[in-house]
């Protein structure tokens, strides 16, 4: 178990419980803030990292001012906050405002069941996988409402594209997670991680036996977040900004925040489901206690999870800088004719591997 959790968080939890029901409520609010605030800050620095990384790929410098580029995202946030929120004359104002909130709320609520280390999770729900599928499916309703309430042909076309794309790839993602559930024997995300523990390091991870499902989930995750090369929802050369074309100021920033929060979420989930979460790739190869500062290298811990997340978050940026946008019909064909049949076949293969003992559950 994480030493930091035992020494700091657990005594703090017990102190809050001493205040009875009020303490339970305050502890829950504190845990929510401990996830929400770092997530918002992470989105800000993720935007800076995206601009710098794309700049390097284009042989440019990227952001260089406002704290040498480090605080450029915060400057952009303040700029958006002070901009006027304009409402189209024929828009449905109530739904126009609710839509970005409906998109943002599920992207934050999904983090409730995401574990960062052993017991370091807001809600260690036994049906965490189902909860995640439900939350990640709700965001599209905000996009549809935004397209409809804007009373714009461009916005409505982007919303319809988003609805079809999310429905298409949500099925493939769900089937991919069925394979993970079969291999782990649990819907609890912490137990899914521990099912990949063992003495063989990364050879015990689900990445190897479930590699086709890993590819399907990763590509579907990119499509779910409407990122390049699946960004037909907001294709600049076709429909300007899609469902966001009529938004400005702070309400536009909410869509922006939801998109990047979802990108970070998908990076976390793919690390948890297929790459052992916080487990070390050399776990079981080396043992012993040297120093708490370096023991995580072979024993595992949240730094490993963050390193894996950083890799996938950077891959999002690489996709944007490298690949051209797919046509709408190509995206639909990939989802329905390739990914869904592939996941169905590999679910059966996974069941056979579990039955025959090829996939062994960890500790």
Swiss-Prot record:
Pfam assignment, any one: NADHdh
Keyword field contains NAD: yes
Membrane-spanning parts: 29-49, 62-82, 94-114, 127-147, 166-186, 202-222, 239-257, 264-286, 293-313, 339-359
GO MF entries: NADH dehydrogenase activity; oxidoreductase activity, acting on NAD(P)H, quinone or similar compound as acceptor; quinone binding
InterPro entries per record: NADH_UbQ_OxRdtase_su1/FPO (IPR001694), NADH_UbQ_OxRdtase_su1_CS (IPR018086)
A Gene Ontology biological process term: aerobic respiration
Subunit and interaction comment: NDH-1 is composed of 14 different subunits. Subunits NuoA, H, J, K, L, M, N constitute the membrane sector of the complex.
Function noted in UniProt: NDH-1 shuttles electrons from NADH, via FMN and iron-sulfur (Fe-S) centers, to quinones in the respiratory chain. The immediate electron acceptor for the enzyme in this species is believed to be ubiquinone. Couples the redox reaction to proton translocation (for every two electrons transferred, four hydrogen ions are translocated across the cytoplasmic membrane), and thus conserves the redox energy in a proton gradient. This subunit may bind ubiquinone.
Protein name (record): NADH-quinone oxidoreductase subunit H
